[in-house]
Amino acid sequence: MQTTLLAVNGTLMRGLELNPNLLAAGATFVREDQTEACYRLWSIDDRHPAMLRTPGAGARVALEVWEVPLAGLAQVLLSEPPGLAIGKVLLRDGSVVLGVLGEPFLCEGQREITECGGWRAYVAARAGEQGPHACVGMRPGRADA
């Protein structure tokens, strides 16, 4: 069976809403990781994140790496919300894997959460689990800024 590595940065992560879609596709968890410092992250209506590559203006984003059977990759992509796609993601060690990325239009008028460092940290800050000053820089943003 052929497989590929897939970096996920939102609701596909372990224990979150869409993780059963990864499991149903036959995926197995490999490790927690981070991107290179060239991505920005937005909260899309507080339902899921969108990560965009922004060379020279980004930060590291926490994510998980999963091994996914090629036959299940389309199933995972089809279960993602509109505006998210599979593309190449640069990891902090310089390696490149497939990953879930957002399209710029999706981020217009949405809250930028890059300073949180990842979706889990944003969700925790929003719930007050990390104190009132967590992710202070959260603000509406533009994908082309």
Regions found by a protein language model. Name each.
Residues 1-145:
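Glycine-aromatic micro-motifs
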